[in-house]
Amino acid sequence: MNQSDKDIKGTTTVGLACKDGIVLATEKRATMGSLVANKGAEKLFKLDKKTGATIAGTVSHAQSLMDVLKAEISLYRLSNGKDMSIDALAVLCSNILKSGPFYVQTILGGIDKDGAKLYSLDPSGSYIKDECISTGSGSPYAYGVLEDRYNPEISVDEGKIIALKALSSAMERDVYSGNGYRLATITDDGMKIYSEDEISEVVKEF
């Protein structure tokens, strides 16, 4: 358990609920203790048309969890003829984590018929609905920016700048976070994952 705790803390992710959607952002460094094991780790996933997630923790567990969630979302649509709500997805993810062990902390975000929703889940399966979330070892530094700049009335265009600024603050102070950004926004038009060039343009707006 001690090793898993270290794995889960060794990253920084951010999720924001905005007036017109969701912003999800992560940095790209993967570590094994004091070793930088990967400088381009994928910690941001598209689960469905308007649903995404960030992960922190053991890589194999995180990938397995994301695969299971994608499959369950597709099965639900086939069986019920409609999309799974974000609330139901959070409960499903909680039940999967409880059946673990999955040494994973995740942020789930998306848009359903009731609007934009954001959840944080830990390895025990506990889940919390919130509007502004950061996870991982860099989260104290990220929250310093988020608490100063975030409010629920911001747009996703404003939110993506704030999210990357929060990650930048974490990357400056946390040795387990770094090597660039991943960024996605979710609106009524769907989930958009940003390219490196598009992210560079957002960073210029800091």
PLM regions and their residue ranges:
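C-terminal catalytic subdomain
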Residues: 165-171
